[in-house]
Amino acid sequence: MSGGKYVDSEGHLYTVPIREQGNIYKPNNKAMADEMNEKQVYDAHTKEIDLVNRDPKHLNDDVVKIDFEDVIAEPEGTHSFDGIWKASFTTFTVTKYWFYRLLSALFGIPMALIWGIYFAILSFLHIWAVVPCIKSFLIEIQCISRVYSIYVHTFCDPLFEAIGKIFSNVRINLQKEI
């Protein structure tokens, strides 16, 4: 241990002292998680993406599945030439496919940037503004709820109990006259 350098039991060199359970920068999370049957935390930034199934949560199942048959249909008795129908199908499908790719290439990254900033702002506001305001409100309202509870038990409970006793002896007899 010379020059502010520390060595752990496995021979690794550190610039900060190592505690038995790990330091705050490099805790023994994996070993501790195995012992305590806890989940390991994975970094969201290093997560691999699936290039085949790009909608694993099926967000756009009912919205964007627009095929040729969903847009253009010829009823019985009103058919165009078969060649025209096939060419229309091919034109529609290829145009939709390549125009989507063109729009994605031009606007995909800027839109991802905009939505990333937007959801970062939403997350920031939720974490640093909304939740603390709600917690603060709940703490402050607790005092008011105690005063309100005392008021109800002191004034309202006896009043409504007395009114209930007054009307408890009221009997209604309904008869049907012919």
Swiss-Prot record:
Phosphotyrosine modifications at: Y6, Y14, Y25
Membrane topology: Peripheral membrane protein
Protein name per UniProt: Caveolin-1
GO biological process terms on file: caveola assembly; cell differentiation; negative regulation of endothelial cell proliferation; receptor internalization; regulation of cytosolic calcium ion concentration; T cell costimulation
Lineage: Eukaryota, Metazoa, Chordata, Craniata, Vertebrata
Record keywords, A-Z: Acetylation, Cell membrane, Golgi apparatus, Isopeptide bond, Lipoprotein, Membrane, Palmitate, Phosphoprotein, Ubl conjugation
Family designation: Belongs to the caveolin family.
Entry keyword annotation includes Aminoacyl-tRNA synthetase: no
Species this protein is from: Equus caballus
Positions bearing N-acetylserine: S2
